[in-house]
Design a protein with these regions (language model features):
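Extended alpha-helical interface modules used as scaffolds for assembling large macromolecular complexes
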Residues: 1-144, 148-150, 180-189
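Short catalytic/binding micro-motifs of nucleotide second-messenger systems
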Residues: 151-159
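Domain-level recognition of nuclease-like catalytic cores that cleave nucleotide substrates
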Residues: 158, 162-189
Length: 189
């Protein structure tokens, strides 16, 4: 179907990506997404997810915390609300749009341990992002783990691989079971 849409000009294909080629078609697509209730959720999710990425890159931890709390409170069943697996599921949800610009790896071997999330930028100009999650610990402890375990080594490649010189943003995210609050801290590594 996508191939036919490219052939007929409804979509364009460049650098391994399919996109809507002109503003008129994009506006029609936006209208359809906003009018079609079943797609409206996807549209809102994509917008919030993009807002989360932009807040992360801007180190706007207040906006990050608001988005995390809203997603956690509206998307997670109350019985598993305090589960670290659910926090990870919320991270997948709020960072959904990051996959357009980054290759996302979970529980990846990095430095002296396993990093919760690592975002490898597709564009060499974009920074790399390392996320570490903690439940009932501070976000500073998560960030300290990123630094202490040298997770940024993952961006330097293995022996014999080409090293990258990306800027790397470390992000510590925590959830407190008692207060039901999320906290975030960021630091350029």
């Amino acid at each position: 179907i996508f191939s036919a849409m490219v052939v007929y000009g409804f979509l364009s294909y460049e650098d391994g990506k399919v996109r809507i080629p002109n503003k008129e078609l994009m506006n029609k697509f936006d209208d359809m997404i906003q009018k079609e209730e079943s797609l409206g959720y996807v549209y809102r999710l994509a917008k919030e997810s993009e807002r989360m990425l932009q807040a992360t890159l801007a180190e706007d931890t207040q906006v990050m915390e608001e988005i995390l709390e809203y997603a956690h409170n509206t998307e997670t069943p109350i019985l598993s609300y305090n589960n670290e697996t659910e926090l990870s599921a919320i991270i997948n949800l709020v960072y959904l749009s990051v996959r357009d610009k980054y290759r996302v790896e979970r529980e990846d071997k990095a430095g002296k341990g396993f990093v919760d999330y690592i975002f490898y930028p597709e564009n060499k100009k974009d920074p790399g992002i390392i996320l570490e999650l903690k439940v009932d610990h501070s976000p500073r402890e998560a960030l300290k783990q990123i630094v202490d375990k040298d997770y940024k080594l993952k961006f330097q490649g293995k022996i014999g691989e080409i090293k990258t010189d990306h800027k790397i943003l470390g992000v510590g995210i925590s959830y407190d079971k008692k207060t039901k609050k999320h906290s975030c801290v960021t630091q350029w590594l």
